[in-house]
């Protein structure tokens, strides 16, 4: 289930616009650099910090990853452990803007002056087991969506 919703409002020269997007009831099998500890020259991520060890098991610590290994084993085959809930809600775009009153604009020989601050991928709420896995991408070896900020000035003469 994919969804998005957008909206905005204007009030006395101020303007706010936003776009949320996400998925619901969606699972993804993670892969790539960092998913398996012995692949790709041994790249480790936060997934591996809570791997099974006899000591951790005996101490009653929370186990979130199978035992680490330097050789391929059943841990490195596709299995249900690597299937994650990829449902998410992301603030994909947001913009805050202010348009100066006409009487001020005319003093500087313009019809309209608008200042804006916008951003993309500002925050995401998800259930992924690692901060290095984006639910939209699903592959640890791929660049995650960048958080981008823009400042703008629009002049109309």
Which residues fall in each region the model found?
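Active-site beta-strand/loop architecture of penicillin-binding DD-peptidases
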Residues: 1
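Long hydrophobic segments that form regular secondary structure
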Residues: 5-14
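Membrane-interface anchoring segments and C-terminal beta-barrel signals
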Residues: 6, 55-157
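Repeated loop/turn-to-beta-strand initiation elements of outer-membrane beta-barrel proteins
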Residues: 13-17, 103-104
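Surface-exposed, extracytoplasmic segments of Gram-negative outer-membrane nutrient-acquisition systems
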Residues: 15-85
């Amino acid at each position: 289930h994919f969804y998005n919703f957008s909206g905005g409002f204007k009030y006395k020269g101020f303007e706010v616009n936003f776009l949320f997007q996400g998925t619901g009831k969606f699972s993804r099998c993670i892969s790539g650099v960092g998913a398996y500890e012995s692949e790709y020259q041994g790249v480790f991520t936060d997934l591996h910090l809570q791997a099974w060890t006899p000591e951790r098991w005996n101490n009653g610590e929370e186990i979130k990853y199978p035992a680490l290994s330097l050789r391929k084993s059943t841990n490195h085959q596709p299995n249900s452990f690597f299937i994650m809930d990829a449902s998410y809600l992301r603030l994909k775009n947001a913009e805050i803007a202010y348009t100066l009153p006409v009487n001020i604009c005319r003093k500087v020989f313009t019809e309209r002056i608008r200042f804006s601050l916008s951003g993309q991928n500002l925050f995401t709420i998800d259930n992924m087991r690692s901060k290095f896995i984006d639910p939209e991408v699903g592959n640890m070896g791929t660049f995650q969506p960048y958080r981008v900020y823009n400042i703008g000035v629009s002049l109309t003469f």
